Curated annotation (Swiss-Prot):
Belongs to the UPF0342 family. It comes from Streptococcus pneumoniae (strain Taiwan19F-14). Pfam families: Com_YlbF. Coiled coil: none annotated. It comes from the Bacteria. InterPro entries: Com_YlbF, YheA/YmcA-like_dom_sf. This is UPF0342 protein SPT_0901. The lineage of its organism: Bacteria, Bacillati, Bacillota, Bacilli, Lactobacillales.
Length: 112
């Protein structure tokens, strides 16, 4: 029987080999090479982290967060590098969602 960690590492290597992963990586590299896109991306990630911290403490984002999110949405849609990155990331997320279902199936069976 193979070691479960070996299987997980093999899965990780497999994900990195997917064309969708490589496309997302290339899109992220393009963002890193562009000062404006990189700045917006970094600010967006910090904002997402702030929202996650609120959620973890049971707090709800207020109206200012909604306005800020809308602002980021406009900035992302207005920047072709960022827009492409998030589109490609969504395509990769389909694989991740499918894998998550497979991996957690044994756990969900225990809860039935």
């Amino acid at each position: 029987m193979s070691n479960i960690y070996d299987s997980a590492n093999e899965l990780s290597r497999g994900l990195r080999g997917l064309p969708e992963y490589k496309t997302v990586k290339a899109a992220k590299d393009a963002i890193a090479a562009d000062a404006e896109a990189s700045k917006i991306f970094t600010e967006y990630l910090a904002f997402q982290e702030e929202i996650q911290k609120l959620a973890q403490t049971g707090q709800m984002p207020d109206a200012s967060f909604q306005a800020k999110m809308e602002g980021f949405g406009k900035q992302i849609q207005g920047n072709s590098l960022l827009s492409e990155f998030f589109t490609k990331q969504q395509q990769l997320a389909i694989y991740l969602s499918d894998i998550e279902k497979i991996v957690f199936e044994p756990v969900s069976e225990l809860l039935k």
